[in-house]
Amino acid sequence: MTPSRRIGFISTRFAGTDGVSLETAKWTTILERLDHKCFYFCGQCDRPEEVSYVVPEAFYRHPEIDVINKVAYQGTWGSLHEGRTLHPETHELHQDFFSVFLRPATITKRIHELRFYLKEELYKFAHKFKLEALIIENASTIPLNIPLGLAITEFIAETGFPVIAHHHDFAWERQRFMNNSVRDYIAMAFPPSLPSIRHVVLNSIQAHDIASRAGVTSMIIPNVMDFDSPPPPLDDYALSARADLGLTPEQKLILQPTRIIQRKGIEHAIELTRRLGIPAELVISHAAGDEGTDYEKRIHEFASFLNVEVNFEAAIVGDARGVTPEGRKIYTLGDVYPQADLVTYPSTIEGFGNAFLEAIYYKRPLVVNNYSIYEADIKPKGFKVVEFDGYISERTLEETRFVLNNPELTAEESEHNYELAKRYYSFTMLEKRLAVLLADCFGEMA
């Protein structure tokens, strides 16, 4: 039995239903099972106050970080004028900027001021909670808060803290980061290469990329769910969900359980719903989040163009049950998933695929786009789902109709999928790998 450790999680936020926050909660569950104590450093937090250390500037959408990112990744005069309008107090930061590849000295100065401030806060965090190890959740992976990433790198270099860097989304995986004026910072800190860091990635492609690009080895730990504890049966509260989501008794509930962002490929779900030719309604469970509303407008227009009934139900699908200000019942995804006739997952890019595992956990039939990680890591396991390659074909429609019209066979395949996921993506697997990582961090036997 390894001794209890005090472990600090660091990220830009631990709140809501984004993938990083969800996976952090799962890691915390396992670590606490192993008798470790967990604490949180971030810019936004919904964890208990007594274990949290919140620094607003650590959030990647803090106004000052927003201004830095506009200069770093959106170096056009249009973006600069927009930045002046949104943040007039930072007008001086933009005066000498003329190319996305050149960084104004004023921006460099402000990055380092924030880096120093955030590093001091990291020291306070470590001392306040008497931390023994750190787990960095994506803050040293995707360069959305450059000062925080630099602060983390310097803190580790100065202290030699045992660190697990849990990577979700690398800069090289996102087009928006290709042209920038912060290549020196990305090379230094996203990800950093330091001897006390153990790197963890979600999939085999990332493991290959981080080795070739950063020269570091990594352990693969995919997303997980608690497949050792099957979902409970529906209770009376959940039974009204279909009606509250606007479905009539004869309609099929097609669930798109993701945020409304472009890489989720929601147009494919709308097209599928239209071309199936059956009474059906597409329910999108999450809002656009903090990545803008342009794509959401596009989805509204596309659904209207194809005359598809789409319900945008983020208002009544949340983290916990409750009531909206208007008096509507709020349901969890656990209330909605078991009542879905079909789950769509048409993403074009994913680090792994939380929604895929959720659909398997709730034993729902699933339509999946062959995104790269699915093709490389998930598909070879032998899951039985409807697949398509970038567009909805007649074969996709035929297979989907067959799934909907043959519930007994679908139930058998769902059980098969559940058992596969239990083998490869369970909390038991996560517990074993975290035990190995922590033992390595502290020089112990796993």
Task: Give the role of each language-model region.
Residues 405-439:
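A charged, aromatic-enriched C-terminal amphipathic alpha-helix characteristic of glycosyltransferases
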